């Protein structure tokens, strides 16, 4: 009997350890290392080779840009000549410079039309310098565009467009020319910034790092960052960070949350969202105000004057409302399903969710985006 009880105790410990480990996540997914981040690049360029779908005559800076490009190749246009070409489009080129990239490596670029170009399909981006916020050129972009959209137009002017045709990408279209310096090895310690600030998660991170690197290796002043002592040698520091970001940490469990997109009407409900006992009555009130005018015609012998008198009509219509009554602990998903079954609009759903939140019956967080 004692042996059986010991086996049950061991199984319970194993199950608890398994459930805890399943909630754990690598530290690298919970934090970002200060000094290791991406940088944004942007540039202005021209896309050529378009089959009549480029910028029109109203976009004057496109013609000026063409003249500047020709001037670099020794071609000078007479004064007062305005270039007109529907095969060229002025574009903005943007790219993401990953941390640690060195000269010679390639990155993807996004090309977006600035003018009234109808489509960039089939175009080629001319050599375009890409600058960071400090104005320094860090990469050069050039290549053929990949445009996912399709546009077609008939002689009568009717057109059909599928997806976006005024923007495209060039995979591996930019070459790094200058490295962005990093301050990763400038300090004796490394700061880890939590992607989701939490005192509990910061405490768990400090405890996990101390178990790996020894007591006092990590400190935290608040719930947003953790300071970790790191080797001064660059090679040893990289190896230390690789080992550090691989350790498993159990983060704080996120509170139940319901997210409502007011533009699209999308409602996303996280697991565990419940409500307290509540009763909701919601009706649809429609108010219609119309403005018009009537002609006031006096009697023929009355001596009056014909006049136009404004007329306002206000119509109020209220549909039949229903009373919803939910017991304690019911899931919010069931509530939304019940509301939707009555034919309620997304605005009605949002109004009910906001009312539940204001009444304190929503056991979670309501986020409106």
UniProtKB/Swiss-Prot annotation:
**Listed GO CC annotations:** bacterial-type flagellum basal body, distal rod, P ring; outer membrane-bounded periplasmic space
Q: Which GO terms describe its biological process?
A: bacterial-type flagellum-dependent cell motility
Signal peptide start and end residues: 1-24
Q: What does this protein do?
A: Assembles around the rod to form the L-ring and probably protects the motor/basal body from shearing forces during rotation.
The Swiss-Prot or TrEMBL record describes its family as follows:
Belongs to the FlgI family.
Q: Which PANTHER family match?
A: FLAGELLAR P-RING PERIPLASMIC PROTEIN FLGI, FLAGELLAR P-RING PROTEIN
Its name, as the record gives it, is: Flagellar P-ring protein 2
Give the species this sequence originates from: Burkholderia thailandensis (strain ATCC 700388 / DSM 13276 / CCUG 48851 / CIP 106301 / E264)
Phylogenetic classification of the source organism: Bacteria, Pseudomonadati, Pseudomonadota, Betaproteobacteria, Burkholderiales
């Amino acid at each position: 009997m004692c042996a059986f009880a010991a086996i049950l105790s061991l199984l319970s410990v194993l199950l608890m350890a398994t459930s805890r480990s399943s909630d754990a996540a690598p530290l690298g997914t919970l934090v970002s290392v200060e000094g290791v981040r991406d940088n944004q690049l942007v540039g202005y360029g021209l896309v050529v080779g378009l089959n009549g779908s480029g910028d029109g005559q109203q976009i004057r800076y496109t013609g000026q840009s063409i003249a500047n490009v020709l001037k670099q190749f020794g071609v000078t246009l007479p004064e007062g000549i305005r270039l007109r070409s529907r095969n060229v489009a002025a574009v903005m080129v943007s790219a993401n410079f990953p941390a640690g990239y060195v000269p010679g490596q390639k990155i993807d670029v996004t090309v977006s039309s600035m003018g009234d170009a109808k489509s960039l399909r089939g175009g080629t981006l001319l050599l375009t310098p890409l600058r960071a916020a400090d104005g320094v050129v860090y990469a050069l972009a050039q290549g053929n565009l990949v445009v996912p959209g399709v546009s077609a137009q008939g002689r009568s002017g009717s057109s059909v467009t599928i997806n976006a045709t005024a923007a495209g990408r060039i995979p591996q279209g930019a070459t790094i020319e200058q490295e962005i310096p990093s301050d990763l090895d400038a300090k004796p310690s490394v700061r880890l910034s939590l992607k989701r600030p939490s005192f509990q998660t910061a405490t768990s991170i400090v405890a996990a790092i101390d178990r790996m690197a020894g007591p006092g290796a990590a400190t935290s002043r608040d719930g947003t960052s953790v300071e970790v002592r790191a080797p001064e040698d660059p090679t040893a520091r990289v190896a230390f960070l690789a080992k550090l970001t691989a350790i498993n940490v159990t983060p704080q469990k996120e509170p139940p949350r319901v997210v409502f997109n007011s533009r699209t009407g999308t409602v996303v409900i996280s697991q565990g969202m419940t409500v307290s006992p509540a009763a909701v009555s919601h009706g649809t009130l429609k108010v219609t105000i119309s403005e018009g005018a009537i002609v006031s015609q006096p009697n023929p012998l009355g001596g009056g004057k014909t006049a136009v008198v404004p007329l306002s009509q206000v119509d109020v219509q209220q549909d039949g409302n229903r009373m919803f009554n939910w017991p304690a602990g019911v899931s919010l998903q069931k509530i939304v399903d019940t509301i939707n079954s009555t034919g309620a609009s997304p605005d009605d759903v949002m109004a009910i969710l906001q009312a539940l939140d204001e009444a304190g019956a929503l056991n979670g967080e309501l986020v409106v985006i």
